[in-house]
Amino acid sequence: MSAKPASTHGTSVRPNVASRLSPTTPTLEDLIAQVKEGEVKIPAFQRPFVWKDEQALQLLDSLASNYPVGSLLLWKTSEKLRTERNIGDFTLPDTDDHSPTDYVLDGQQRLTVIYSCLGAPEDESGFAAGYDLETENFIAMSDDLPLTVFPLRALFNTSRLLDYRTALQSRPNKEDLQKRLDSLVRILSGYRLPVVTLKNLKLDEVCPIFERINSSGTRLSIYDLMVAATWSRDFDLNARTKTLAGHL
């Protein structure tokens, strides 16, 4: 008796997504540079940043321990979506409408922490963290912290990092502090975050992928995607739906 073929009822032929996946492993510094240039954007359907300070500090500790922290999923497309230019509290530059954009499908919370703690200017608002070289713990930055707390936003600022190294020379245990700083800088500078980019996929091909993504229990629906994809200066599907619902 021959086996019955698997049912395809209610499904359509799916695209060969695997052939259009592009895995890369950029350094944290390279990823931050992409964010600063506006090449990576947050779609409007994504939730706002919701992580608590402890979650952010735990991520930093995982990075410094060289632990895997999961991958980012991006969708590279020339389709214009409604985007939130802000990543956390940071307003990022616009890019021209013709350049492909990498939209964050999964990993927004992690990317926001990485940018806020390691890439943002030191005088910017938003969550900032430091590394206590005495206790070897990550802490939230605040006023009047001791010199031994290294501000992580100085990590990829060469002149600022050199100034901090020089300041450490005034400490009696400067050798130990310097070794711990060097170790931290080496690990975070060399850390590579897996990034999977979906390329050459149309809107209807991306929809099933959106449906499968689940971030902290919040599933992205086809409606969420359609709101983002159909938005323009003259049309907002979400606003139009609410208006119509109000007349029913």
Where are these regions (language model features)?
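Basic- and aromatic-enriched surface patches that contact anionic nucleotides/nucleic acids
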Residues: 2-248
